[in-house]
Amino acid sequence: MQQSSELFFASSNNHKFEEAQRILSNLGLEINMFKTTLEEIQSNSMNEIAKRKALDAFRKIKKPVIIEDDGLFIESLDGFPGPYSSYVYDTIGNKGIMRLLENIETRNAKFVAIIAYCNGDDDVQLFESSIPGKISLSIEEGGWGYDPIFIPDGESKTYANVSDKDKFSHRSASLKKFSDWFMHTQLDSGL
């Protein structure tokens, strides 16, 4: 098992860290939080945003680090807010998203998550997953971020109210891809 002092999760978001820690721990990988505010470039490319954040995090901590970036892509809004999800949430929130979707029947959406790993060189590894779903008709209680309005396919409740979000969330799927790669890489390098 990877020692917790050797791998860090960089974020200013405690919710993201707690979710990542819980998921990775269940996969046999321990992480520590590196609480920091990372450079958040504005780009149409989530990959570019994730790479820049991972490089920024490594420059600050000088240790192997992962970051997570995600976006909510709403079909009827041409993928908006997409890579601008964090900014949009901070400015208009879930109420603003619901106003944009007033009188719109097609509420299909997907959540995309990217885990980016950097260990010092400029070769950032990316692990992406997406979960299809739809936007609810109302804002549910609980959860954080867009959880109260996103209903994953096959569910009748939003992320905020499903019993085990970790089993099928976009973040969980990306973290699993990262964990599989990281554990395999560690075994290959003899660490």
How does the language model describe each region?
Residues 2-8, 15-191:
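Anionic-ligand binding patches
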